[in-house]
């Protein structure tokens, strides 16, 4: 039997040849295979034929139905592929075009200052040491020559958690822990940057702030070694023309002790409002490690000596960037932070 001469098949081909998208194809499908479609009606009309002709006529109609179904499936896949290619063509990305740049974050100014300080001291042979911010009273005070009845404890108002545990008031406990760990081995050269906590809050003080302390322990360490290290640090950080001045001071954990001043970075030492006309700015405290601190850490103070120093990173940053209110560092003001 020549199926191509069948009227129903030819009628279908005449309709489907004009189809250009999936919606039109669905319309043709419904027209021929739907409940009221051409093929469905032809099958229903079989009852009007004589019984002996029904099987052959039904076979012909089902053959045409199968051909239509197969052709519809084929055309549907072709149209789907065509639609996909058109979509991909419209959404194609030209990889040669410049992309959109992302806004990159920056390091906090205090972090930048800390990194610079660490860089300077590590270039002089110091290594970085860290310790817990929740500290034992022993390491924060007693091991640093500040027993419970020492009057110097009144110099610092502390955040106590229990009677024997507090938020550290300085990073000096790190120095004690390092000495205990390595005693009696020598030498020790460390810096210990980190957060510290005190009950203080005004334009030049914060209840939480950052410090960086340093320690060197060895045989025959002298005060002149301390002076040389600090002078190198100051000239690297503030510039080669910066001068340094040492003033006698008192710290329970060092003896002798000294405050370290630098020539004013604003006026160059001539005198201005920032330095209050003196030409000098205080930046850190220092001194030779107290013999009692060495002994408590496990060293023989008759043979071993050392020096220590400590500075507030906010103080250094304020001088470097000309900032007059420490609280700006912690206000999370994006306008301020974008300046650095």
Swiss-Prot record:
> Which parts of the sequence bind Mg(2+)?
255
Q: Keyword annotations for this protein?
A: Aminoacyl-tRNA synthetase, ATP-binding, Cytoplasm, Ligase, Magnesium, Metal-binding, Nucleotide-binding, Protein biosynthesis
In which domain of life is the source organism classified?
Answer: Bacteria
Q: Name one GO biological process term.
A: phenylalanyl-tRNA aminoacylation
SUPFAM superfamilies found in the cross-reference section: Class II aaRS and biotin synthetases, tRNA-binding arm
Q: Where in the cell is it found?
A: Cytoplasm
Name the cofactor(s): Mg(2+)
User: Cofactor note, please?
Assistant: Binds 2 magnesium ions per tetramer.
EC number(s) stated in the UniProt entry for this protein: 6.1.1.20
One GO molecular function term?
ATP binding
Its family remark reads:
Belongs to the class-II aminoacyl-tRNA synthetase family. Phe-tRNA synthetase alpha subunit type 1 subfamily.
HAMAP family, alphabetized: Phe_tRNA_synth_alpha1
Instruction: Please give the PANTHER family that the UniProt record associates with this protein.
Output: PHENYLALANINE--TRNA LIGASE, MITOCHONDRIAL, PHENYLALANYL-TRNA SYNTHETASE
Task: Supply the name of the protein.
Answer: Phenylalanine--tRNA ligase alpha subunit
Source species, please?
Answer: Carboxydothermus hydrogenoformans (strain ATCC BAA-161 / DSM 6008 / Z-2901)
Which lineage is the organism of this entry classified under, starting from the top rank? Bacteria, Bacillati, Bacillota, Clostridia, Thermoanaerobacterales
């Amino acid at each position: 039997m020549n199926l191509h001469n069948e009227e129903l098949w030819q009628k279908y081909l005449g309709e489907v040849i004009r189809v250009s998208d999936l919606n039109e194809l669905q319309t043709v499908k419904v027209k021929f295979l739907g409940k009221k479609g051409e093929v469905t009606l032809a099958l229903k009309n079989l009852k009007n034929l004589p019984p002996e002709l029904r099987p052959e006529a039904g076979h012909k109609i089902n053959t045409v139905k199968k051909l239509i179904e197969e052709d519809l499936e084929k055309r549907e896949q072709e149209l789907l592929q065509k639609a996909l290619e058109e979509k991909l063509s419209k959404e194609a990305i030209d990889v040669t075009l410049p992309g959109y740049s992302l806004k990159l974050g920056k390091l906090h100014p205090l972090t930048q200052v800390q990194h610079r300080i660490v860089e300077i001291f590590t270039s002089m042979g110091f290594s970085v040491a860290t310790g817990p911010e929740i500290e034992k009273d022993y390491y924060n005070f007693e091991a640093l020559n500040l027993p419970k009845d020492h009057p110097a404890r009144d110099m610092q108002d502390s955040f106590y958690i229990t009677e024997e545990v507090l938020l550290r008031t300085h990073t000096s406990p790190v120095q004690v822990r390092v000495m205990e760990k390595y005693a009696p081995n020598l030498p020790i050269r460390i810096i210990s940057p980190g957060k510290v906590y005190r009950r203080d809050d005004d334009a030049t003080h914060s209840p939480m702030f950052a410090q960086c302390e340093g320690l060197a322990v060895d045989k025959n360490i002298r005060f002149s070694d301390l002076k040389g290290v600090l002078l190198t640090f100051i000239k690297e950080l503030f510039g080669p023309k910066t001068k340094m001045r040492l003033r006698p001071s008192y710290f329970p954990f060092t003896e002798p002790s000294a405050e370290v001043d630098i020539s004013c970075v604003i006026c160059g030492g001539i005198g201005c409002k920032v330095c209050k006309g003196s030409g000098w700015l205080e930046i850190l405290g220092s001194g030779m490690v107290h013999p009692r601190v060495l002994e408590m850490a496990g060293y023989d103070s008759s043979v071993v000596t050392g020096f220590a120093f400590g500075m507030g990173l906010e103080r250094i940053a304020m001088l470097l960037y000309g900032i007059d209110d420490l609280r700006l560092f912690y206000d999370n003001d994006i306008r301020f932070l974008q300046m650095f």
